[in-house]
Amino acid sequence: MNRLSNEDRAKILHLLCEGMSIRAITRLTGASKNTVAKLLVDAGKACAAYHDANVREVKSARVQVDEIWSFTYAKQKNVATAKDAPEGAGDTWTWTAIDADSKLIVSYLVGSRDAEYAVAFIQDLADRVAGRFQLTSDGLNAYIGAVEDAFGDDIDFAQLVKIYGPTVTAPGRYSPAECTGTRIRRVRGDPDGAHVSTSYVERSNLTMRMHMRRFTRLTKAFSKKVENHAHAVALHMMFYNFVRIHKTLRVTPAMAAGVTDRLWEIEDIAKLVEEAEAKPAKRGPYRKGISN
């Protein structure tokens, strides 16, 4: 069986991180679809493990959180009639938390947009940030209980609630109604109204759509398995935090946040995959959990 060199792995991973679909990569590199897909899975696992172990004790004054929509296998309205729809088909949400100063993605979670995932996401965020900070979310009610459970009174939390105009119905329209204004809802602590914003996390949503082909609207490159969707997100977050230089900061977010003291290359992510392969596999019962 042929094995990809680290150079070939790095090339394929870079193409994935720059928004290219799996089939397009096979046409460019000559690697099989299964080879590219397996590398995505292996890289996603390695990147998720590295993030979990190393993005800890982050010093942050302000964090913004949001959820970005995509779908797996079929859109939610079509899942009931879709042929052989797998578990996890339909709406797929990615929860993200960004540090407003360093632009580091501190925490992320792939799953549903409900109270259970809100609790898991906010608890993970609490485990990664050191000290008290100001948190801003959108108006999703699930955040209120999740923040109370994770932080109690040790946080300054506000929600930026958007006010929308009337819904415009037109053939092929998929965007939401026009936002006509916002209002601040102070939930816990003493949040500074001047910094109640979700602008940075919403801008990072655009970066995700530009750098992951499966997030691009109106294409056939959407995820077919929710597990692979989560692996793609993990790879992107590693690339965004450690490899891609932020234009404004002139360093990577991980460097700006003090998580690392050097600029990573895409080859470093390929090395993470190689190191993970060298470790003996752990034996034990399979337990399906929430994808991080």
Give, region by region, the residue ranges found by the protein language model.
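Residue-level recognition of single "structural anchor" positions
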Residues: 1-292
